[in-house]
């Protein structure tokens, strides 16, 4: 999204520049993989894979140019401390431009977007090989810094999937079939202003749209539509803000104006706490309700301060008094033309708490929508899912050998020795070692790590957002919240063998 034309080869960490000269000489192939070492919540360890296509479009598919090399080289001349020249693999990248038309000479295998996985499952694997004498194997983790950033859309996609699954249960309990479509709009993205960059808003906002359709982050909807073969993704409604409300001498006049400009049969959301939320509910709502109902408008009350749970419940009871309510076939109250949206103080767990309170109060889940801003797009970091890219295998001339990290002081950072494959067993992802005679087993014919890049574009077909949505909903519904069988018996054995070899080499306290 930047107009600065940033040199692509500088989009890595400085220490990556020296790594090609630090790996063992004579290596023929190096492999590394991306994984999540932890879940979003301990009580639900499911994770949604998302963000790979954008990484493909902006990182893997970007062809290296002579200008990239020249600009990087010029800047790096003064990057070293004490006036030392910062050495970097300029020669390898020059070969990429001269012999490979700028295409990155790596292979990348990845899971399908929308896959529901658990910690330790590899999301993608980077395969770097020597090609016709060119030492590209040593570029195995050069792109790690840039590719690592898919952690952010993965966190957001996971949050939205988790919320949808929870609200699905509430809808099943309290909403009639003809109103089930409203589930798509129950979580609305309010996060664009609360993120650190335009790109973050677009990419993480698009991740939200893999489970819901409601968004005020229009650039996210634009990207989602582009990734949906042009079929529109992302909807919203007319809504006021505090600046609109406080511009009028009388707040009720602002409310009336909002209803006036809303098309008949439309939706109008009005922020209700500019002065007194209680006054809005008791004084303004009885006045505006008949005006909205006369136009067939759904009038949505939006509290924006105070206790989120209490604000929603108070709003529902006030709407019931002002608009009236009917009891549906499932025994829950449905307000006639009124609703509440809570967008302040919302995170995943708080949303669950509100949804429980709404059900306990006897209201149908369709009567409440939720807006999430920073809690959806920004309040997260790389450690939210504890993502990492680690070397997993090396070929020093005698075939691939597994490599792993196993720090004695923090076993949670243990990585997996490769190479490996991911297969679905009973509908759940499981990791197997891929070596020896393992390929003779028919279970391994459907490796879920598919080649998306092989020293250039392949015939891999990216799925649409609609297809990704269906995969998430299907796999989430068929998965369990916690899975203790992520690693196959064979992978556990491989892990134990490699760990034992490490202990022999580096005994704790030795």
Residue ranges and their predicted role:
Residues 2-62, 213, 217-219, 287-291, ...:
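Gly/Ser/Thr/Ala-enriched C-terminal appendages of enzymes
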Residues 268-270, 340, 370:
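Hydrophobic/aromatic residues located in beta-strands of well-ordered beta-sheets
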Residues 31-99:
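N-terminal, Lys/Arg-enriched amphipathic/low-complexity engagement segments
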Residues 107-118, 122-124, 442-445, 450-452:
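Active-site and channel-lining beta-strand-loop segments
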Residues 77-108, 113-117, 129, 297, ...:
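Long alpha-helical, hydrophobic tracts
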Residues 52-60, 72-76, 92-96, 100, ...:
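Generic structural signal of hydrophobic/aromatic residues within well-ordered alpha-helices
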Residues 2-33, 37-41, 96-105, 114-329, ...:
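Buried, small/hydrophobic-residue-enriched core segments of structured protein domains
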């Amino acid at each position: 999204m930047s107009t600065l034309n940033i040199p692509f080869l500088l989009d890595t960490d400085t220490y990556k520049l020296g790594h090609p000269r630090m790996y063992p000489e004579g290596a023929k192939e190096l492999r590394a993989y991306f994984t999540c070492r932890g879940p979003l919540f301990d009580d639900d360890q499911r994770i949604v894979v998302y963000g790979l296509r954008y990484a493909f479009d902006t990182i893997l598919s970007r062809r290296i140019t002579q200008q990239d090399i020249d600009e990087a080289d010029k800047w790096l001349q003064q990057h070293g401390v004490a006036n030392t020249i910062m050495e970097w693999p300029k020669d390898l990248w020059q070969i990429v431009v001269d012999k490979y038309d700028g295409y990155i000479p790596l292979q990348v295998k990845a899971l399908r977007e929308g896959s529901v996985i658990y910690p330790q499952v590899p999301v993608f694997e980077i395969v770097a090989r020597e090609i016709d004498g060119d030492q590209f194997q040593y570029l195995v983790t050069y792109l790690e810094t840039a590719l690592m950033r898919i952690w952010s859309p993965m966190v957001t996609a996971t949050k939205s999937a988790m919320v949808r699954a929870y609200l699905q249960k509430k809808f099943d309990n309290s909403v009639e079939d003809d109103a089930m479509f409203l589930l798509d709009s129950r979580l609305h993205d309010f996060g664009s202003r609360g993120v650190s960059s335009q790109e973050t808003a677009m990419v993480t906002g698009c991740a939200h749209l893999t489970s819901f359709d409601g968004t005020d982050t229009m650039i996210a909807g634009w990207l989602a539509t582009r990734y949906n073969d042009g079929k529109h993704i992302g909807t919203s409604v007319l809504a006021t803000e505090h600046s609109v409300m406080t511009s009028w001498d009388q707040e009720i006049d602002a409310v009336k104006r909002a209803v006036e400009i809303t098309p008949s049969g439309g939706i109008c959301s009005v922020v209700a706490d500019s002065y007194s939320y209680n006054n809005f509910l008791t004084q303004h709502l009885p006045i505006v309700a008949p005006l909205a109902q006369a136009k067939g408008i759904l009038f949505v009350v939006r509290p924006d301060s105070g206790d989120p749970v209490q604000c929603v419940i108070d709003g529902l009871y006030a709407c019931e008094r002002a608009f009236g309510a009917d009891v549906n076939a499932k025994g829950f109250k449905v307000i006639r033309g009124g609703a509440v949206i809570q967008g302040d103080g919302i995170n995943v767990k708080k949303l669950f708490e509100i949804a429980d309170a709404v059900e306990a109060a006897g209201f149908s889940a369709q009567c409440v929508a939720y807006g999430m801003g920073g809690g959806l797009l920004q309040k997260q970091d790389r450690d939210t899912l504890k993502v990492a890219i680690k070397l997993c295998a090396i070929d020093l001339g005698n075939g691939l050998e597994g490599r792993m990290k196993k720090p004695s002081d923090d076993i949670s950072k243990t990585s997996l020795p490769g190479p490996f494959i991911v297969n679905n067993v009973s509908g759940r992802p499981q990791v197997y070692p891929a070596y020896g005679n393992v390929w003779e087993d028919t279970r391994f014919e459907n490796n879920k790590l598919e080649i998306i890049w092989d020293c250039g574009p392949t015939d891999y077909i990216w799925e649409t957002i609609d297809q990704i949505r269906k995969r998430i909903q299907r796999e989430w519904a068929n998965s369990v919240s916690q899975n203790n069988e992520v690693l196959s018996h064979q992978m556990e054995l491989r892990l134990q063998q490699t760990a034992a070899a490490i202990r022999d080499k580096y005994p704790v306290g030795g």
